[in-house]
């Protein structure tokens, strides 16, 4: 019986030692890092026409618009050197109210960079009087 009490006492002391009191806690929650979002906006623009695309900015930062390509709608893949209007604004019914704009020809750099606060915005591509026929376009939008 003494041996059983000794084994029980040893087990109790060992478990008490393992419970050494640490008051610190370690969080295992993952941290969330929000990086830039890239969206491709593709469509067509008729002479004297426009197209727009709405998007949500999650945090204050730059919104970059790049008119990546413009091509003939009658001969897809044929690059057009025409200059179009490129703008950023806020959606308004079936259009986009322009806040900032720039003329742009297709290229691989941002033609319009605007610092924006969180909210709903839109990119608008439009004819500035140069189009003789409908064109296809692609705009890359990078934002936070």
Model features per residue range: what roles?
Residues 61-63, 113-132:
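Noncatalytic modules at the cell exterior or secretory-pathway interfaces
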Residues 15-18:
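C-terminal motif of bacterial Sec signal peptides marking the signal peptidase cleavage site
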């Amino acid at each position: 019986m003494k041996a059983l009490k000794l084994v029980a006492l040893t087990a109790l002391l060992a478990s008490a030692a393992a419970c050494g009191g640490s008051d610190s806690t370690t969080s295992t929650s993952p941290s969330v890092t929000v990086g830039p979002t890239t969206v491709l906006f593709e469509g067509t623009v008729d002479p004297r026409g426009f197209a727009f695309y709405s998007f949500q900015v999650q945090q204050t930062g730059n919104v970059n618009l790049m008119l990546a390509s413009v091509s003939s709608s009658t001969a897809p893949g044929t690059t057009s050197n025409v200059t179009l209007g490129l703008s950023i604004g806020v959606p308004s019914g079936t259009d986009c109210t322009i806040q900032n704009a720039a003329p742009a020809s297709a290229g691989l750099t941002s033609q319009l960079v605007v610092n924006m606060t969180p909210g709903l915005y839109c990119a608008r591509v439009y004819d500035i009087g140069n189009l003789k026929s409908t064109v296809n376009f692609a705009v890359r939008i990078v934002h936070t």
